[in-house]
Amino acid sequence: VGSEMCIRDRWCNTIHTPWNGDYHLNINLQMNHWPAEVTNLSELHLPLIEWTKQQVPSGERTAKAFYNARGWVTHILGNVWEFTAPGEHPSWGATNTSAAWLCEHLYTHYQYTLDKAYLRDVYPTMKGAAQFFVDMLVQDPRTKYLVTAPTTSPENAYKMPNGSVVSICAGSTMDNQILRELFTNT
């Protein structure tokens, strides 16, 4: 069928590509695949689905090494070498809900195909992403809700009352939405 699409993919005319030719998992990769199911081109979703499943072993090592958590995680950058660790800048690199967001694509494919054998195949991947957050969620001291922490709202920063600019937060709205969907689907 082909390969999953990254920001510059095959169309780059240089050896060193912008964004390192990686897969940005904070909307870019996902958005490239949104039309697949709704346009009745489900087979175009398959490379992303296979790539997602291939991230699990590396993501399990990252979950254990960085968070001492079960399951699997991937951050904002991905590539063909199964890179799942945090990126180098906290404003975007600390985003740890990318595996959960990728699992939305696994479930969307099932919703359009209703293929139960396929769902049995991808469910362990979805469950592993959910297990990571079962271990990672913490109680917000003010609201008492379970939230992701540490996390970011990708590529956003916050100005603190003292004027300092920070990127790391707890319970970003994006995380809340992605995790609600992941937990609903698993």
Where are these regions (language model features)?
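Extended, well-ordered alpha-helical scaffold segments
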Residues: 1, 44-55, 118-133, 182
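Short, small-residue-biased leader/transition segments that mark boundaries at the very start
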Residues: 2-7
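The feature captures the catalytic groove of carbohydrate-active enzymes
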Residues: 9, 14-22, 70-119, 134-186
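Carboxylate/His-rich catalytic cores and anion/metal-binding grooves
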Residues: 25-72
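Hydrophobic (often cysteine-bearing) scaffold residues that line and stabilize catalytic clefts
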Residues: 28, 41, 45, 98, ...
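Short amphipathic alpha-helical face segments that pack within enzyme cores
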Residues: 31, 101-105, 128
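Structured segments of extracytoplasmic/periplasmic soluble domains
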Residues: 35, 51-58, 109-112, 129-132, ...
